[in-house]
Amino acid sequence: ISECLVGSEMCIRDRLTLSDKCYRAELVLGMTTDTQDADGEVLTECEVTCSEDEIRQAIMSFVGEIEQIPPMYSALKVNGKKLYELARQGVEIERKPRIVEIHHIRIEEIALPYVTFTVGCSKGTYIRTLCADIGDKLGCGALMESLVRTRVGTFPIEEALKLSQVEELVREGHLEERVIAPDAVFEEYEAITALPEADKALSNGNKLYFGQVRAVRKRFADGEWV
């Protein structure tokens, strides 16, 4: 699932980028690669001897705030160069760990060496790194076999359209009926009612001052989205 913004809706792109994500992933135990997924060069292989209970405990131990070291094969930039560009040149540099949050994990199936699970997480979480870290914790290594993003913010994959469906809607003249209003991005947040005289300032992206507020339903913390 990937969002598609049109026209003035591009201004909320950063908000979607900051949204939590949900994924369905399959990992393979007993194997590691240089990319942490099935497309990379195999680095190690070993027999998987851990039990299902040990696997479950290891996976669930990652729920909450954790530190992750971004993989070399990623689009993060260092000194203007993307890490994956450096990795392809055989260059590996030190990456600082980052704090991410795993909100929940549900283990769907264990059919060794494969484990399928769903995960909800904060922005900036690398699921293939999570798979690799799970393998490290179990002592046998692991890689990510497959990944599907199933939710972005409040938008589930069930509401997504395939490109072929979009093309058909365009031909039939019904595409606008399926376009979601940008307000939907903010449905998960508390609302503030502003006075009419603040409309122009807000539409131009300016700050809202307390004297321009008509109604507030709760007290907000510094930095909280509304």
Regions found by a protein language model. Give the residues of each.
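Acidic, low-complexity central loop/insert segments
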Residues: 15-68
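Flexible, glycine/proline-enriched loop segments at strand-loop-helix junctions
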Residues: 40-50, 72-74, 92, 117-118
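A structural signal for short, well-ordered beta-strand segments
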Residues: 25-27, 105, 117, 147
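Single conserved hydrophobic/aromatic residue that forms the stacking wall/gate
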Residues: 1-7, 12
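Accessory RNA 3′-end/elbow-binding domains used by RNA modification enzymes
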Residues: 19, 53, 137, 141-226
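The conserved catalytic core of RNA pseudouridine synthases
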Residues: 92-124, 128-139
